[in-house]
Amino acid sequence: MLKHVFTKTLIVAAFLMGIAVTSQAAPAQKICPLMIEDEIDEEEFVVYKGIKVYTCCGTCKKLWSQNPDYYAVVSVEQAPQLKAVASKTIKPMAQRFCPVYSDTRVHPKSPSMEYKGKKIYFSKERALTRFKANPTKYEKNLK
């Protein structure tokens, strides 16, 4: 009987320690990892390798699904909970944001075009079309 109570006590203690460690592992996420000027909506999230990653909208959830491994690597600042699961082998591109929607991330599979001898990435086809219509307007956003 005493052994049974002791075992249950150990299980409960281990469970509570696990919760404490998990809750202290990373600061709370406040900013969308893909549209980095927007706050998260707690109803809009994806689960990446068992970790909840909040986004600002359904559009960002769809965007995340296009290249989750890459986005996990470049989004650690906005979503610190990703640090433990983000790839250590994926390297971020030099261009991180769309020149048209300058707060929105791009990835290696994003729509792209050659411009002045350089490959430029866009968050979506509409952004690429806008850039083609007036590239000088968006050149300043090419970082």
Language model features with spans:
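Intrinsically disordered, low-complexity terminal tails/loops enriched in metal-binding residues
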Residues: V21-K143
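Bacterial N-terminal signal peptides that target proteins for export
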Residues: M1-I11
